[in-house]
Each structure stands twice: as C-alpha cells, then as structure tokens.
C-alpha cells in the first residue's frame, strides 16, 4: 500500500513538472517575418538619422510576440546598430555594408515594436540609446534634440538618441499623450536622468 502511494506521488510530481516546463507559444511566427521586422526597424532608424552613413543591426533578439488576431501580430525586438562604410546617398542595403572599424565607432542599443499583418510590416516604432561600452557618454548627447549622427562628428548633427540607462533598466516608448504634454523644444522632461532632455525616440 505504501509502495503504491509512493508511486502515485512520484507520478503526480513528474506530471506537475511536465506541465510547468511545457508552455504554449504566444505566436508561431515565421523566421522570415522576424527578418522583415528587423529590416523595417533598421530602415526606420536610417530614414530619420542625420548621419551621412547607414546603420546596420547586429545581435538582434525577439523579446515578445503578441498575436492580435489570426493574421496580425506585434513583435518587440532588441538589437544593436553601428555605422557602416556605406553612405546614405548610396541607397545600399545596410545588411550588405561593412561596419566601420575603430575603437571610437559608437554602438547604439535599440528596441522596436513592429506591427505586422499578413506577413507585411504595417507600423514601426524604434527607440535607441548609446551603449555605455561605446565611449559615447559625452554631455552633448544628453540634451534634447540630439539625433543619431556620425561617429566622427556626431556633435555637429542633431542626435536622436536618449542618454544611456543602466543595463537592468527597461526601455519604453513614451505614449502619444505623454509627448503632447511635453512638446518639442527646450522644456525639461521629468525622468531619472538629471540635467537630461529626452527625445521621444524614432517614430
């Protein structure tokens, strides 16, 4: 009797472990959709950057996938970007361009939310900040109105990147209502970074 009870207990525990370890994916997305979403995110950055060079992504990952309906979803991506040797006017595919080399070439960390329908990109929101490991922590980049510029003379450009956050702090896209309350200009934005004026990000 005791052996039977012990056997039932073992089966119960193993069964509980099985159900807690297995899970249901939020959405069984096609890898091609991920590639399309990443390409659209990089294209959004390059379309709003004032750098003379194109940016290219690397170290990308999917953070979340939400199914909106049978044919629509949103993807939250995180990736890093760096300037390439291709100039903007070349209209080249950034994925085919070589990265610029050198210790002082900065790296930016970006998060994007991409809405897709019928495997086609509908909307893209991207927000980036300079990586603390890239050596781009100058005070000029902490002011509102700085836009993603070139690594050699980016202070001559308006940089659209927010000041760097701590690695463990999440990065969120402000809502439209928040941006209405804090219009473009020299007004300070209430945030955890002292003396920093924050850009609402790429949109």
UniProtKB/Swiss-Prot annotation:
The modification Phosphoserine is found at residues 90, 138-139, 166, 175. One of its GO terms (cellular component) is extracellular region. InterPro entries: Cystatin_sf, Spp-24. Multiply phosphorylated at serine residues in Ser-X-Glu/Ser(P) sequences, a recognition motif for phosphorylation by secretory pathway protein kinase. Pfam families: Spp-24 (PF07448). It is found in: Secreted. Residues 1-23 form the signal peptide. In liver and bone but not in heart, lung, kidney, or spleen. It comes from the Eukaryota. GO terms for biological process: bone remodeling. Disulfide bonds join 86-97, 110-128. Its main location: secreted. Keywords: Disulfide bond, Phosphoprotein, Secreted, Signal. Could coordinate an aspect of bone turnover. Belongs to the SPP2 family. This is Secreted phosphoprotein 24. It comes from Bos taurus. The gene is SPP2.
């Amino acid at each position: 009797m005791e052996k039977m009870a012990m056997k039932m207990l073992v089966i119960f525990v193993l069964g509980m472990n099985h159900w807690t370890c297995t899970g249901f994916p939020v959405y069984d997305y096609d890898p091609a959709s991920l590639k399309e979403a990443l390409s659209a995110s990089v294209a959004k950055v390059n379309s709003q950057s004032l750098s003379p060079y194109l940016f290219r992504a690397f170290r990308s990952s999917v953070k979340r996938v939400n199914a909106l309906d049978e044919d629509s979803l949103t993807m939250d991506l995180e990736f890093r970007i760096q300037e390439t040797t291709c100039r903007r006017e070349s209209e080249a595919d950034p994925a085919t361009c070589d990265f610029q080399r050198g210790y002082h070439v900065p790296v930016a960390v970006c998060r994007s939310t991409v809405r897709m329908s019928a495997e086609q990109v509908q909307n893209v929101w991207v927000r980036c900040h300079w990586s603390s490991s890239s050596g781009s922590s100058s005070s000029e980049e902490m002011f509102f109105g700085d836009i993603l510029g070139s690594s050699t003379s980016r202070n001559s450009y308006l940089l659209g990147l927010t000041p760097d956050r701590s690695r463990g702090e999440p990065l969120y896209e402000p809502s439209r209502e928040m941006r209405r309350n804090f219009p473009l200009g020299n007004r300070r934005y209430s945030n955890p970074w002292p003396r920093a004026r924050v850009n609402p990000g790429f949109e």
